[in-house]
């Protein structure tokens, strides 16, 4: 299993990149969102990867964060959602947006992804809604890849010919996991807590953990 590829960006296609790792080129399929965040050709890049195996084809799919990779895996468990459809959803919404849409039952947002029809979008929401809280709670430990040191130059090459490897710019740190943990400690059910936190995050994208908890508690409070 190839879980990470780090090297030099050699080529950019419409839906994939070619990463040179010590002279071996890896074709990695990425979402539109990830492709837009790629550095220039000849610069270093690192992606978490998922190897998708079919009868006559092996394909690598790349992600800037581990949480996005895990969401891709989960999306592919839904009948009718293949690897590229999963990438389309993540490309349109991002990992946090996907989590929020599924948790809130917002099939319309899922349907906004290219190639995703209303039936598939509804199926994604229905099948994954109960699984979303556990994955959302992973958010704190699945940050984007940090810059890494370049590999040692091969014999006969100059050290200056290899640039520092780095990941695409990471998204804003998520406070979702900490808010979910706090609500769980207060005795709220995971599904209820996830829905409240997702709604709070959607209404206040820049909210920190404390603000998310306060907003979620208001949403969870009994209606008079």
Curated annotation (Swiss-Prot):
Region: Domain II; residue ranges are: 65-143
A GO CC annotation recorded here is: cytoplasm
- Which superkingdom heads the taxonomic lineage of this protein's source? Bacteria
User: Where found, per UniProt?
Assistant: Cytoplasm
Q: Which chain positions lie within coiled-coil regions?
A: none
One example of the protein's molecular function in GO is: four-way junction helicase activity
Q: Which SUPFAM superfamilies match?
A: DNA helicase RuvA subunit, C-terminal domain, Nucleic acid-binding proteins, RuvA domain 2-like
What's one GO BP annotation on this UniProt entry?
Answer: DNA repair
Summarizing the function annotation, the protein's role is:
The RuvA-RuvB-RuvC complex processes Holliday junction (HJ) DNA during genetic recombination and DNA repair, while the RuvA-RuvB complex plays an important role in the rescue of blocked DNA replication forks via replication fork reversal (RFR). RuvA specifically binds to HJ cruciform DNA, conferring on it an open structure. The RuvB hexamer acts as an ATP-dependent pump, pulling dsDNA into and through the RuvAB complex. HJ branch migration allows RuvC to scan DNA until it finds its consensus sequence, where it cleaves and resolves the cruciform DNA.
Q: Which UniProt keywords apply?
A: Cytoplasm, DNA damage, DNA recombination, DNA repair, DNA-binding
**Family membership noted in the UniProt record:** Belongs to the RuvA family.
**Region annotation (Domain III) ranges:** 171-224
Q: Where is this region: Domain I?
A: 1-64
Kindly give the Gene3D superfamilies that the UniProt entry links to this protein: 5' to 3' exonuclease, C-terminal subdomain, DNA helicase RuvA subunit, C-terminal domain, Nucleic acid-binding proteins
Where does the record place the region Flexible linker? Answer: 144-170
Which residue intervals make up region (Disordered)? 141-185
Supply the name of the protein. Answer: Holliday junction branch migration complex subunit RuvA
Q: What is known of its domains?
A: Has three domains with a flexible linker between the domains II and III and assumes an 'L' shape. Domain III is highly mobile and contacts RuvB.
Task: State where it is primarily located.
Answer: cytoplasm
UniProt cross-references to InterPro entries, sorted A to Z: DNA_helicase_Holl-junc_RuvA_I, Hlx-hairpin-Hlx_DNA-bd_motif, NA-bd_OB-fold, RuvA, RuvA_2-like, RuvA_C, RuvA_C_sf
Record note on quaternary structure? Homotetramer. Forms an RuvA(8)-RuvB(12)-Holliday junction (HJ) complex. HJ DNA is sandwiched between 2 RuvA tetramers; dsDNA enters through RuvA and exits via RuvB. An RuvB hexamer assembles on each DNA strand where it exits the tetramer. Each RuvB hexamer is contacted by two RuvA subunits (via domain III) on 2 adjacent RuvB subunits; this complex drives branch migration. In the full resolvosome a probable DNA-RuvA(4)-RuvB(12)-RuvC(2) complex forms which resolves the HJ.
């Amino acid at each position: 299993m190839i879980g990470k590829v780090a090297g030099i960006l050699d080529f950019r296609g419409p839906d994939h990149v070619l990463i040179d790792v010590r002279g071996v080129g890896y074709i990695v399929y990425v979402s539109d969102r990830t492709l837009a965040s790629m550095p220039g050709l000849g610069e270093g890049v690192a992606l978490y990867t998922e190897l998708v195996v079919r009868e006559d084809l092996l394909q690598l799919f790349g992600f800037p964060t581990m949480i996005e990779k895990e969401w891709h895996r989960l999306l592919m468990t839904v009948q009718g959602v293949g690897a590229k459809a999963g990438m389309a959803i993540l490309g349109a919404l991002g990992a946090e947006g996907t989590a929020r849409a599924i948790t809130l039952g917002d099939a319309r947002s899922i349907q906004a992804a290219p190639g995703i029809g209303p039936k598939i979008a509804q199926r994604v929401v229905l099948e994954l809604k109960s699984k979303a809280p556990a994955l959302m709670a992973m958010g704190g430990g699945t940050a984007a890849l940090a810059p890494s040191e370049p590999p040692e130059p091969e014999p006969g090459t100059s050290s200056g010919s290899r640039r520092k490897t780095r990941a695409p710019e990471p998204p804003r740190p998520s406070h979702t996991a900490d808010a979910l943990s706090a609500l769980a400690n207060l005795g709220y059910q995971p599904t209820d807590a996830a829905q409240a936190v997702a709604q709070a995050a959607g209404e206040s994208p820049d909210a920190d953990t404390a603000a998310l908890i306060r907003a979620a508690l208001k949403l969870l409070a009994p209606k008079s």
